[in-house]
């Protein structure tokens, strides 16, 4: 397995960890009666994520943000893998992406401004660098 595919697998596991963190925080915040309900707007009045306190809501947003970033990172890994273009540079970019995504969660949770945005930017640059390195 290439380093990029290894990092992709680890990024998917990170998504699972983020899901667990967000789920536990949401259940502690809102209670099982709401989180295990059918979540009908007419019954609850608004979506569950809008009812969350600040910190659980941040975990929710970080979780969703990783879905968005993971889509592009997956594209980058597929491009590198199918082109058989894995290099030390693309491998380093993949690890940088994962490090940035790991750092992003506490940065978002603790509201670290401007660090959260800078961490996101590092991961995004690493992702696009993988694609560009494969194309040139």
Task: Give residue ranges: language-model regions.
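A loop-to-helix transmembrane entry motif
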Residues: 54-67
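Juxtamembrane boundary at the C-terminal end of a transmembrane helix
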Residues: 87, 129-136
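Interfacial loop-to-transmembrane junctions
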Residues: 100-125
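Core segments of transmembrane alpha-helices
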Residues: 64-77
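Hydrophobic residues within alpha-helical transmembrane segments
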Residues: 10-13, 63, 95-99, 118, ...
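N-terminal signal-anchor transmembrane alpha helix
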Residues: 1-42
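Helical transmembrane-bundle signal
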Residues: 12-22, 74, 78, 101-104, ...
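Transmembrane helix-loop junctions in multipass membrane proteins, especially transporters and channels
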Residues: 23, 27-31, 84-85, 113, ...
